[in-house]
Design a protein with these regions (language model features):
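Extracellular beta-strand solenoids
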Residues: 101, 107, 113, 121-123, ...
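Short aromatic-glycine motifs in intrinsically disordered, low-complexity regions
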Residues: 117, 134-141
Length: 282
């Protein structure tokens, strides 16, 4: 799988910029995602000395709100934890964060983002006719698209900001619970599964099938997905996910077929291979 922007034709058009220049560019062109994206850039390199205490406090609040089923308090707490957790431990004095800007582009085949760069900014639309993997599972890497993002399959971790529209066949989001997928426009997909990424959509969300097993999905516009209210139910996930991509939840103790089964590590592998996670064809 090829890497952008390092080992392809974009390399000559790619330029490195400072953190201040990155914030200025995102502030100017970021639209609805600008404020949160700039905040992430700033927080990375201004780590709090009270980080551990703050995370412990938020973890306790999240536990309480989750047990009480209070979504109104749970969602802000999850978002606050994600922001704080994304800021790294104090870096060495000689550490210089890396920011790269690439122009709008269309990529042929399968690609993944450069994980040696702290933040990749696409100044325009990013289109891939194959699978696109952003940030792997890293919680301290960021991709900002100052336009729309389109791909056949999309696997995203860390911090991903898309100013306009996000469209793909199958979307998978996981960043070990501390990342964010933020879209300033609409998300339009066949399937969307999150297993550890806080998702916020300023526009509408349209999906044939959707699953959420760890964090919340906040949509300011309309939700066009028949199973949205059941997105965390094991029974619902079993209705549309290929059985070979499911595994029993050991903590539940219920091994009956079709109950308490959740996506396994094979699910993201299917997405990365360019396949469909569904048990049937739409």
């Amino acid at each position: 799988m090829r890497v952008f922007p390092d080992d392809n034709f974009l390399d000559s058009a790619c330029r490195s910029i400072s953190g201040e220049a990155a914030k200025a560019l995102v502030s100017l062109k970021g639209g609805r995602i600008a404020e949160d994206a700039v905040s992430v850039i700033e927080d990375w390199f201004e780590p709090s000395l009270e980080k551990a205490r703050l995370l412990a406090d938020l973890d306790e609040r999240i536990r309480i709100h989750s047990s009480e089923g209070d979504q109104g308090l749970l969602r802000p707490a999850l978002k606050a934890r994600a922001v704080i957790a994304a800021s790294p431990e104090p870096a060495p004095d000689d550490y210089e964060p890396s920011f790269k800007v690439v122009p709008a582009t269309t990529l042929g085949g399968d690609w993944k983002s450069d994980c040696e760069t702290d933040c990749v900014i696409v100044d325009g639309d990013l289109i891939a006719d194959g699978t696109l993997i952003l940030n792997d599972l890293s919680e301290t890497l960021c991709v900002i698209v100052l336009g729309s993002l389109r791909a056949r399959n999309l696997d995203c971790g860390g911090w991903v900001f898309v100013r306009d529209e996000l469209e793909c066949d199958h979307l998978y989001a996981c960043s070990l619970n501390d990342g964010i997928l933020s879209v300033g426009g609409n998300i339009t997909v066949q399937t969307f599964l999150e297993t550890g990424t806080y998702t916020q959509v300023a526009g509408h969300l349209t999906a044939s099938y959707l699953g959420s097993t760890h964090n919340s999905i906040d949509v300011e516009g309309k939700v066009n997905c028949p199973g949205f209210e059941r997105r965390s139910d094991s029974d619902y996930l079993c209705e549309w996910i290929d059985p070979v991509l499911l595994e029993a939840d050991d903590s539940d103790g219920d091994w009956r077929c079709g109950r308490q089964r959740y996506p396994s590590a094979d699910y993201p592998e299917r997405i990365r291979a360019g396949g469909s996670p569904m048990k049937f064809v739409l």
